[in-house]
């Protein structure tokens, strides 16, 4: 079965941002920002389910891992880095990994997102195990690095979730607890 085009790649009124005035750009960004709370509200039950399983696993000594590529990976690393000072948890309770490694936080690492096996190798460096939870982050829901990591984690009995901005994506189908904000 051929996968449909990700929602993030469908035609939209934003295909030609370069033709908009600064005022039009700002107005459109602001209008899109206004839609976020409603879109989040629509998936609150899914968010709750994922959080419940993460909390249960952490109570058993488990950790939360994020994997992503590009901006999605950076957001996972950012969230993980904020957990110790904000919530007083240890540095190894929430771990963010980005395709291409730490170098990719500041510079693009071309094609790192296309390696379906690298995420699992990266996760093994942290001794990921069955008490842990892996959350894949990919706006399109099609990033091979993230999908490969989720699939390998599931094969090894690790609970998986995802955050994506495309409905019925390969990533959402591979995850046990998908969150699709569309």
Which residues make up each language-model segment?
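A short, well-structured juxtamembrane/interface segment
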Residues: 42-57
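Glycine-rich phosphate-binding loops that contact phosphosugars or nucleotide phosphates
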Residues: 65, 69-182
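Cofactor-/ligand-binding subdomain signature composed of acidic, glycine-rich
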Residues: 1-39, 43
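N-terminal glycine-rich phosphate/adenylate-binding segment common to multiple enzyme folds
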Residues: 53, 57-65, 75
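Short, positively charged patches
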Residues: 8-11, 48-52, 63
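Structured helix-beta-strand junction loops
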Residues: 32, 60-61, 174
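Short secondary-structure boundary/capping elements
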Residues: 17-21, 46, 111-118
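Short gly/ser-rich anion-binding loops that grip negatively charged ligand groups
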Residues: 37, 44, 105-109
